């Protein structure tokens, strides 16, 4: 079966990777994603660990904070693009709208499929709309 065939299968679970350095936000995101329906959820506090996960298996959706220690969200997105990530990207940050939109534009210029750029805290409706669930 081709690698993308499982993702196209109606019975396949949506795979989501959430990268944020806030433990509480990761748990809130887990609950919000679970409320969207069955999915495989991976949570990462560290961008390098998240890149290792991407290198092992590409998720369908990547939810990424922009402000991270050691490697910021932009650097992470550049690395994800260089790995060939082709799934949806949702950006999260407490930064100003202009900064988030500039990051989204940069991610799109890298070939990433940004489906949302939201200010923290993310509302459940925003997540559902971005994921179409």
Language-model segments: what does each one mean?
Residues 23-42:
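Two-component/phosphorelay signaling modules centered on CheY-like receiver
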Residues 46, 72-78:
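Acidic catalytic/metal-coordinating carboxylates
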């Amino acid at each position: 079966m081709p690698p993308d065939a499982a993702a196209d299968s109606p019975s396949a679970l949506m795979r989501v990777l959430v990268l944020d350095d806030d433990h509480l936000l990761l748990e809130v995101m887990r609950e919000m994603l679970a409320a969207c329906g069955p999915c495989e959820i991976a949570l990462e506090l560290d961008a390098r660990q998240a890149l290792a996960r991407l290198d092992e298996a590409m998720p369908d959706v990547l939810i990424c904070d922009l402000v991270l220690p050691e490697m910021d969200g932009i650097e992470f997105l550049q690395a994800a693009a260089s790995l060939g990530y082709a799934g949806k990207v949702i950006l999260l940050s407490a930064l100003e709208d202009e900064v988030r939109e500039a990051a989204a534009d940069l991610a799109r210029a890298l070939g990433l499929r940004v489906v949302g750029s939201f200010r923290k805290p993310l509302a459940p409706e925003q997540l559902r709309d971005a994921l179409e669930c």
